[in-house]
Swiss-Prot record:
Gene3D superfamilies: Aconitase, domain 4 (3.20.19.10). This is 3-isopropylmalate dehydratase small subunit. InterPro entries: 3-IsopropMal_deHydase_ssu, Aconitase/3IPM_dehydase_swvl, AconitaseA/IPMdHydase_ssu_swvl, IPMI_Swivel, LeuD. Pathway: Amino-acid biosynthesis; L-leucine biosynthesis; L-leucine from 3-methyl-2-oxobutanoate: step 2/4. It comes from Aliivibrio salmonicida (strain LFI1238). The gene is leuD.
Amino acid sequence: MSGFKQHTGLVVPLDTANIDTDAIIPKQFLQKVNRTGFGKHLFHDWRFLDDAGQQPNPEFVMNAPRYQGASILLARENFGCGSSREHAPWALADYGIQVMIAPSFADIFYGNSINNQMIPVRLTDIEVDEIFQFVEANEGAEVAVDLEAMLVSANGKQYSFEIDEFRRHCLLNGLDNIGLTLQHADKISEYEAKIPNFLK
């Protein structure tokens, strides 16, 4: 995986709190275990008026022409609550979302997002309010996220955020659990060479 350092992108404002993983990717689309192909089902019950996903809901913000191509999702508190399905960050990533900004995230969803090289940025309610106002008032508004400096830049302002150093290291270097293990491949091979044959 390639690492994440900075990203500037169009923001889609989803002004709803407590969005759960069943809303993000409904259960009927969870048959696959690979990470691709879920983007078309993202927020299915909100984006579409029919079960087949052929009739877009014109009232849903992500269907608005001004937000097409958005790579940053702005939301309210407790985003990603509910079941622990990893398909939720898979669907967001497959749709094109690279960064999520909210006052808080459900713990398991937060970890799953980082494991999938997505950046969940926690800001205060007031800071999120300011970004909502900026995005909704300015068509084409973009926000910049700098993981190295741990800063969000919007409308001439900068907002600092925190992420623990280990997770930040993984994101900056594009490391998932396998990548972390492979960083120690030499030591693993050295240890394996010392194991008696009868234990192999």
